[in-house]
Amino acid sequence: MDRIKELALIVAGIDEEYQNGIIDGVIACAKDNAANISCFSAFGGVISGKGYDIGEYNIFNLANFERFDGVLLMINTISDPDQKNKIVAKVRKSGLPCVVFDCEDYPDFYNITIDNTSAMEELVRHIIRDHGAKRIEYLSGPASNPEAADRFEATKRVCAEFGIEIPPECIHYGEFRSNDGRRTAQKMLASGRELPDALICANDAMALTAISEFTEHGIRVPEDMIITGFDNTYNARHHFPSLTTVGRPLSQAGYNACDLVIRLIDGEECERVQRLDAVPVFAESCGCKSALSEDLAAYKKSTYHVIDSCREDINLLNRMNSELAEAESEAESMSVISGFLGDMDCECCCICMCDGWDSAWEDNGMISDGYSPKMHAPLIWDKGTVRYFGSFDTTQMNPVIHETGGNISYFLPLHFRERCLGYFVAINGDFPTKSMLCHSVLMNISNSLENIRKLISLNSAIRELDRLYVIDPLCNIYNRNGFIRAADAKFRECRRKNEKILISFIDMDGLKHVNDDFGHNEGDFALQRLSSTIVDCCREGWICARFGGDEFILLGTNVDDEDETILGETFRTRLAQINKLMNKPYLIEASIGTVVTRIKDEDTLFGLITLADEMMYQQKKKKPSRYIRR
């Protein structure tokens, strides 16, 4: 039996109809040949934020070409030039057979191309010759996109045939996204220029939103202005007015590309370029009659299905948002998400998280370029069964290993702005390409995980602030605040149980002399050694603190009267041992006053502390005034 072929598909914007059509053909061919497809897809260019695009395009860094036999590269769907160059360089370095679509910029790759120019020229010629358009504006895709450039050049050539020039202010650029059409229409309306006879758009998505914007302002299409598109999408065919556009055999292009790369893997000699023909579709937006003769009942049924699906999608998003808002940990979030994966029509879904994605501190462990060396999959939903997959090498990419061919796995990024959190894997289902919900679900999951990360950071910061509030930074024991908080509970417990309590007040002797004669670093060192001696004197359940300056305090429970003497002797013995070990030119000495008593009704914690302080002072008065060793 032949080894199963593994193919990588690199693409952006799989929710768009162009990408959909090609991917459908790729999948059909892969199934016919029992090959597996791993599709790495980003939704780049959706918003203007640079950080968001960095997070999206990072998914391409996941592709480990050492595990693939061939590459299908839809480089024409990626608008960022730096990302294009980076991906192309990696594919070239891999040495794998690679097929691109509609792109002649990389002659070392094989190319499945649909003739963008002939049909576009015929469409523009029709607008000028048959409908009398003289003033034309053009809405292009990205200037760096070869398809966009081909369509624009075709438009200019035909305009030149008729002596028509498109001035620079009448040339607009977008990202092939629907919002570009609306923004361009708004820009044209705000310019104060006379509207053109025709607005020619480089794709249907931009053309349709331009029509909507102009219609809202009382401008009729085609009566006041002709608008055309390119792609002959479902929405273009069923819009009113139906869109004059260019139809392309997208599914056939995808099938041919997959078939080509499989034959290349098998060692066949193949032509570098395969060309498919596109055809102009003249419809109502230019003033022609639509050629569409679809059964009205079927169209109504299809439209109802779209509306009903949209309603269900909104309901699902609302429920998911509400439930994810309650999640406060990775486990809780995965539990919520697992309850919705059954609605996504995939055989299997995986959530793979970077090690340290929930790092508490903003600058610690943040990944924006690539992934952590190890990943873990806190959620694998497999035909209704939920399981956890532990740590695995990121080079493996997919925690689910396919033992058969004909599988399609979509790898989609999980991130917050440029911060990489992990990725989502959807296996054998149409959800990533056919559902309007996919991108929103991924953003919901990402935002929920980021909220959890921030909650972890906030709780960590609160704990650190609390520690700083109650811990003395020099001696690393309680400060006055920490002691009062801890001692108050022990004091009340002793009173309730009618048990004796021990309170010792300790004051270092001669700290000023150490600071003055040997420097403050030595003074700090002496305080730390005294602190460690006091800690060593504490039994289990006792607490101690630096009460301020050179003053320390110790509180003990479960004590007897003789513990006052035992504590004093232990303290002096250990202090002597410290001095002997240090062999410093000064002695660390301290005065101690201790109270052991059963708490009476009128006693207070501060009252007993004051009593211990007075006893300490009486001991200090008996000592000489010189503490420096000569």
Range-by-range predicted roles:
Residues 1-319, 323:
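Bacterial carbohydrate/catabolite-sensing allosteric modules
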Residues 398-402, 406-415:
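A short, aliphatic-rich beta-strand micro-motif
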Residues 319-323, 459-480:
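Amphipathic HAMP/coiled-coil signal-transducing linker helices
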Residues 323-365:
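Helix-loop-beta substructure at the N-terminus of cytosolic sensory domains
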Residues 296, 520, 565-572, 576, ...:
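Catalytic-core segments of nucleotide cyclases and related cyclic-nucleotide turnover enzymes
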Residues 543-546, 586:
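A short pre-motif secondary-structure segment
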Residues 466, 479-502, 512-536, 545-549, ...:
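Conserved long alpha-helical elements within nucleotide-processing catalytic cores of c-di-GMP signaling
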Residues 430-450, 459-463:
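Amphipathic alpha-helical "output/dimerization" segments
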